């Protein structure tokens, strides 16, 4: 089963939870209800069935939305062929790079992008320069936007890595990375949400006393479930390993 409401509640009430806000009690009441549902579900399972509860991300308080394409425009790195731009196809050949959510950056490479203008010979220098700019970008509060900026070679592997972004920004807590093409008045803004996804505090519970939880990774979930189901599989097909 999937509980989507946990995501929605955290987006709009996480700051209340973390900073003793107006709706902190309602936040706790919601999780008590989720816990109750999980308990009822576990009671209906046979004794030899292992229950696994996992989330694919954690949450953190959101302070600022970062409109990266607006930032690229202000840096002179993004240009559009029309003043009434609204989509990726409106980018001109004079553009150096563009961004897609969440924190994916593409060099406007000639021969790869529809209106590519950056040559293969200039690719590495252009990407290195953009990476340096992203690493030094600070928010209105003086905090660095990026926890780290990762190249495609380090971030992706597999049969389709050729379509991966050239750079990926992993944000510090407090920043939500945006990338629309209609334009924004400011690089940094505040929206209706006060909570945003984080990479480092996802939830994992395996109802097995011998399960290895320490240093677990999302990659470990699939082989764990396959082992619990006694399903044969080629262990070399997975990056993770079973926790049971």
Where in the sequence are the language-model features?
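Low-complexity, glycine/alanine/valine/leucine- and proline-rich hydrophobic stretches
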Residues: 168-222, 230
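A short acidic (Asp/Glu
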Residues: 10-14, 62-66, 180
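Histidine-centered active-site/metal-ligand motif
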Residues: 8-12, 18, 57, 192-198
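Short secondary-structure boundary/capping segments
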Residues: 15-19, 65-74, 184-186
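Secreted, luminal/periplasmic, and some membrane-associated catalytic domains
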Residues: 40-175
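Short, solvent-exposed loop/turn segments at secondary-structure junctions
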Residues: 4-8, 16, 58-60, 111-113, ...
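Active-site His/acidic residue clusters
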Residues: 1-36, 40, 110-114
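A short beta-strand-to-alpha-helix junction
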Residues: 32, 80-101, 116-128, 196-199, ...
């Amino acid at each position: 089963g999937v509980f989507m409401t946990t995501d929605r509640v955290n987006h709009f009430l996480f700051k209340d939870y973390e900073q003793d806000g107006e709706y902190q009690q309602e936040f706790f009441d919601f999780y008590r209800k989720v816990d109750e549902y999980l308990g009822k579900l576990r009671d209906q399972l046979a004794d030899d069935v292992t229950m696994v509860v996992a989330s694919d991300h954690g949450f953190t308080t959101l302070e600022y939305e970062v409109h990266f394409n607006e930032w690229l425009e202000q840096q002179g790195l993004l240009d559009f062929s029309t003043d009434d731009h609204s989509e990726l196809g409106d980018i001109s050949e004079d553009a150096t790079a563009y961004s897609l959510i969440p924190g994916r950056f593409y060099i406007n490479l000639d021969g790869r992008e529809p209106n590519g203008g950056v040559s293969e010979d200039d690719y590495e220098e252009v990407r290195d320069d953009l990476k340096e700019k992203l690493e030094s970008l600070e928010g209105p509060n003086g905090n660095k936007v990026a926890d780290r900026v990762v190249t495609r070679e380090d971030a992706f592997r597999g049969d389709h890595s050729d379509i991966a972004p050239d750079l990926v920004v992993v944000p510090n807590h407090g920043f939500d990375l945006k990338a629309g093409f209609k334009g924004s008045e400011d690089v940094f803004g505040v929206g209706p949400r006060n909570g945003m996804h984080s990479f480092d505090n996802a939830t994992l519970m395996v109802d097995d006393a011998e399960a290895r939880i320490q240093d677990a990774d999302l990659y470990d979930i699939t082989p764990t479930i396959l082992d619990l189901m006694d399903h044969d599989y080629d262990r070399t097909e997975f990056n993770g390993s079973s926790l049971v």
